[in-house]
Amino acid sequence: MRACSRLVTVAAVAVTALAAPVTASSGAPAATPPRCAEKDLTLRAEPSDDSDGVLKLSVRNDSARACLVDRVPTVTYAELDGAALPVPTVPHAGRTLAAHTTVYAAVRSLSDSEDAEDGARTVLAVHVVTVPDHDGRTFQALKLGAPAGVRVYEPVTTLWQSSAHRAETVLEEQTTGRGMFAA
């Protein structure tokens, strides 16, 4: 698997999807909010208190108006090719983030597979982007509770959720096969 080409494809699809109009429940096109300006977002990452090996992400819209972020955070690992795959697997699209609202995602960097122990790589930084054409933010492993580095093998991330608890629940359901579609 060439993860680098997959990342480029994911980013290209995400940019295209953010330009797509949002549809209201009546089926009529709704006014599409603009993409969030990077200066209007506060992006955070921290280790989960409840689940080993899980990072909690949050992004807050600090502006006074609604705007769009990608509905899946793009999470990459230092010099490694590729990005964490979304669970559930869905096409990229925009997610409206209301003014002064925060959404959450959960990221598992190391799979539970038997191959993970031998195949895992260790990185000293995790990079997160909320809108494909933004620079995003890099979080050092030490600040993420991993002084020896973050171990990575088949990483996955949830879509943005309404609460940190919901994000971790979706991650658990999706990675154990007990999940339902959760957008």
Model-found features: residue ranges?
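Membrane engagement elements in two modes
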Residues: 1-53, 80-90, 103-110, 119-183
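Residue-level detector of beta-strand face positions
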Residues: 58, 76, 125-127
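Ligand/cofactor pocket segment of small-molecule handling proteins
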Residues: 50-56, 70-73
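Short consensus segments that form the blades of beta-propeller domains
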Residues: 66, 116-119
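The feature marks short-to-medium sequence segments in extracytoplasmic or secretory-pathway proteins
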Residues: 65, 69-102
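Asparagine-centered strand-capping/turn motif at beta-strand->loop junctions
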Residues: 57-64
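Mature extracytoplasmic domains of secretory-pathway proteins
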Residues: 96-97, 110-114
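A mature extracytoplasmic/lumenal domain signature
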Residues: 63, 71-73, 109, 132
